[in-house]
A protein has these predicted regions:
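Bacterial signal peptide processing site
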Residues: 27-29
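Generic extreme N-terminus detector
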Residues: 4-6, 58, 256
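Solvent-exposed, non-transmembrane regions of membrane-associated and secreted proteins
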Residues: 61-273
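Intrinsically disordered, low-complexity serine/threonine-rich repeat tracts
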Residues: 31-80
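Bacterial N-terminal signal peptides that target proteins for export
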Residues: 2-14
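C-terminal motif of bacterial Sec signal peptides marking the signal peptidase cleavage site
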Residues: 22-25
């Protein structure tokens, strides 16, 4: 009897183990790594109603939302004032109307340039020190923005009988002279610039018939710029083969020409550096 009871217990344990293995193989994942021993109970007389499994909702970890931070406030920087070139500081201190210096290699033109913003032709008979002088000095049209600069800067100078001031502009009536001396160096008090001459022509101060080159400062559009350039080239004594394009800054030099009534001789150049 003892042997038979022992055999039954062994058989019961074996059957229990087989049942557990069968349940695990069907996808039921154990809740932990140990298995509670099975306690045999009497079969229930009434059908057991299965209870609903409790589902535990997993709350995802809260991810903090990015916080927008304003960039650090910075003090607004004031625009830096341009520095006057060393070589022109004394001149500008002597007369704040001094705006630069013009030199044309191959000519005697090597003079300061001034501008009176409030009185037209103020320097027609005054030197750069504002002293009375028959020869005057080279001066820019009062409405031109020399430092921006405008699309065109007009500068006037006398044709003196002794060959000074703008008298040498008349040499540009000959193409051979232009070929050897086609560059103008015009420095403002702040910057060095070089211009290339593209047209030289006669005109008149009689506005009813003359080319009003002197009132062209800033082009309202490309057509206006192109018209100015085309007119200069059509009046020119010869073709230089140079046609400035919108965006290229121009300089117009004007002096007297006594070959015609109220005559003017005009040299026009484009900035190349």
């Amino acid at each position: 009897m003892i042997h038979t009871a022992f055999c039954r217990r062994v058989l019961a344990l074996a059957l229990t183990g087989a049942t557990l293995l069968s349940l695990t193989a069907c996808g039921q994942e154990p809740t932990d790594g140990t298995t509670e021993p099975t306690v045999a109970t009497q079969p229930a007389t009434e059908a057991t109603v299965p209870t609903e499994a409790t589902v535990t909702e997993t709350v995802p970890e809260t991810v903090p939302e990015p916080v927008e931070t304003a960039p650090p406030e910075t003090e607004p920087t004031e625009p830096t004032e341009p520095q006057i070139l060393y070589e022109y500081r004394v001149l500008h201190e002597v007369n704040p109307d001094v705006i630069g210096w013009m030199t044309i290699p191959g000519t005697v033109i090597d003079y300061p340039v001034v501008q009176s913003l409030y009185e037209r032709n103020f320097y027609l008979r005054r030197n750069y020190l504002k002293q009375n002088a028959t020869c005057g000095t080279l001066y820019a049209r009062e409405r031109c923005d020399v430092f921006k600069p405008a699309d065109n800067i007009t500068i006037y100078g006398h044709k003196m009988g002794n060959g000074t001031m703008f008298a040498d502009l008349h040499n540009y009536k000959q193409k051979s002279f232009w070929e050897e001396n086609k560059y103008i160096h015009f420095d403002t008090i702040y910057e060095h610039h070089t211009y290339e001459i593209f047209a030289a022509f006669r005109s008149t101060a009689d506005l009813s018939i003359g080319f009003r080159y002197h009132i062209f400062d800033d082009a309202a559009n490309q057509a206006e710029y192109d018209t100015f350039v085309a007119t200069c080239k059509s009046l020119a004594d010869y073709d230089t083969g140079i046609t400035p394009q919108l965006g290229e800054k121009l300089i117009t030099l004007s002096t007297c020409d006594k070959s015609i009534d109220q005559g003017r001789y005009v040299v026009v150049a484009r900035m190349i550096e």
